[in-house]
Each structure stands twice: as structure tokens, then as C-alpha cells.
Amino acid sequence: MQAKLIIGNKNYSSWSLRAWLLLREAGIEFEEHRICLDVEGCAEEIARFSPSGRVPVLLLDGQPIWDTLAIAETVAERWPEAKLWPQDPDARAHARSISAEMHAGFHALRDAMPMNCRAMGRKVALPDALTSDIDRVIAIWSDCHHRYGGSGYGDSGGWLFGEFSIADAMYAPVVLRFRTYGINLPDSACSYPERLLESSAMQHWLAAAESETEVIEREETGQ
């Protein structure tokens, strides 16, 4: 099966990161096609591949799958050997729940703290809605660490459910947001960001983001 992933700028496109990381960690070979966002002609180029006019979109033998969660579910279905959801039914239900929560929510966090891989030490105001989103993410990570971080579960790989899952792809951009804007984490929530950032796939993505020269001014938030 031929797989081609259409993504946006690696520095800014959080949904592109989710789909890309999922494929890389699953060990799936794919062609990458990057479209520079927010420039003349980008909408027309995206529309060549994506019925929704958004990235990412995954082409499997030419068939488009758009929306990151749809991509994730399709990949998990087509490549069951990748075990992209936890094998335990209760853990799998938990992983699906927090993935859907990230997919549908955290609007204050998205608006106030856009992903910007190159930026470090940025500061933004923390109104109540944003603080609530941050606290909820920390609670999710801490709960996963408590439930699944012990020896004997998922080989204790340091991911949210021991081994890499779709949930990790969904929360990866939040790790980068917290890094960019200097969000302090309690000890119970620190191990997951550390695990993600040290992975070879994330190191590859960050290096590519660093090498990009495009600047999207509306994404350059904070001082």
C-alpha cells in the first residue's frame, strides 16, 4: 500500500505533527509532501489533495483520509500489527477518551499558545480559561503516569500508556507548546514530555522545523 502524507509547516502545524508522528512511530513507510501555509496559492495546492481544504491528509493508494483522528483510526485499522491503541480494553477506552478530548477541546490553549517549535522562552497571559486547559492536561498526564507508568505495564516505555499510542500523537504538540511558553510541570507530569522530546522521531521533526525559514506572523505569539 502506498502512503503519502500531506502536511503543513513543521514549525507551526500541530495537526500535521500528530499524523506524521503517528506514522513514524508505527514504522510505516510514507512519502511526505509539505505545503507552506499562509502563502499565496497554498489553499489551491491543499485542495488538490484534501476535500476539507485542510492539512494533514493521508493518501492511501490515492484514497484521501483527512482529519487527524480519522487518519489515526484508519492507520490503526489498516496496520493492526502497529498496536496503536492499548491492548487492554480499559486502557484502550481511556486512550480513546483522552484522544477525543484533545481533538474536540482545549480551545483556550490552542488560541493563546500556538505551536511554534523554534521559539523558546515566550510568555503569554494566563487567563482562567487557559489555566483551566493547562491544569486539565497536567491532570491527564499525571493520571496516566500513575496508572500506566509502573513496571510491568506496556514495557514501561515512558509513553502515556506505556507503549506509544495514538494518545501520544494527540498530545505531542502540547508538549511543544508547554516548552515554548515555559509552563512549569509537577513531577508527576514531567516524564511524558521528557520521553517524547528524546524520541528519534521528535528529534527529526524539531530539526526540520528549525531549518524552515518561513514565518507566519499570526502564530508568533508571546514575548
Can you say where each PLM-predicted feature lies in the sequence?
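Active-site-flanking alpha-helical
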Residues: 76, 174-175, 206
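Short flexible/disordered coil segments
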Residues: 95-101, 147-153, 215-223
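Short capping/connector residues at structural and topological boundaries
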Residues: 89-90, 165, 207, 211
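GST-like domain detector, emphasizing the conserved glutathione-binding G-site
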Residues: 1-127
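GST-like fold's C-terminal all-alpha helical module
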Residues: 102, 106-200
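Basic/polar N-terminal segments that are highly enriched at the extreme N-terminus
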Residues: 1-3, 139, 219-223
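Short, contiguous strand/loop micro-motifs
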Residues: 5-7, 33, 162, 179-180, ...
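Long hydrophobic alpha-helical segments typical of transmembrane helices together
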Residues: 188-223
